[in-house]
Amino acid sequence: MYKGIIKFVKRETLHEEFVINIGIFNRPSTAERFRKMLQEANVGYDVLLILERI
């Protein structure tokens, strides 16, 4: 199982704007699909996924 965290980094300044705990996932690919969806909806940001194995 994996604990997922999403970070929004503003592209222009590379400043971290938001950090969101997205919960627990059985597979990393599920969290990656969620990250990709957020990235497509927020073009001014780089959306980073951090996974921690628990």
Predicted regions and their residues:
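A short beta-strand micro-motif
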Residues: Y2-K10
